């Protein structure tokens, strides 16, 4: 999901 993706690029 988008939350996981956001954490990955941070």
From Swiss-Prot:
PTM annotation: Contains 7 disulfide bonds.
This protein's record includes keyword Membrane: no
Taxonomy, superkingdom: Eukaryota
Tissues expressing the protein: Expressed by the venom gland.
Keywords recorded for this protein, A-Z: Disulfide bond, Secreted
Any GO CC annotation of this UniProt entry: extracellular region
Cell compartments where the protein resides: Secreted
Family: Belongs to the phospholipase A2 family. Group I subfamily. D49 sub-subfamily.
Quaternary structure and interacting proteins, as annotated: Heterotrimer of alpha, beta, and gamma chains; non-covalently linked.
Function as written in the Swiss-Prot or TrEMBL entry: Heterotrimer: Snake venom phospholipase A2 (PLA2) heterotrimer that acts as a potent presynaptic neurotoxin by blocking synaptic transmission and synaptic vesicle recycling. Enzymatic activity is essential for the neurotoxic effects. May act by binding in a calcium-dependent fashion to neurotonal pentraxin-1 (NPTX1) and neurotonal pentraxin-2 (NPTX2), but not to neuronal pentraxin receptor (NPTXR). Also binds to taipoxin-associated calcium binding protein 49 (RCN2), a protein localized in the lumen of endoplasmic reticulum.
Name of the molecule in the record: Neutral phospholipase A2 homolog cannitoxin beta chain 1
Organism listed in the record: Oxyuranus scutellatus canni (Papuan taipan)
């Amino acid at each position: 999901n988008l939350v996981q993706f956001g954490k990955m690029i941070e």
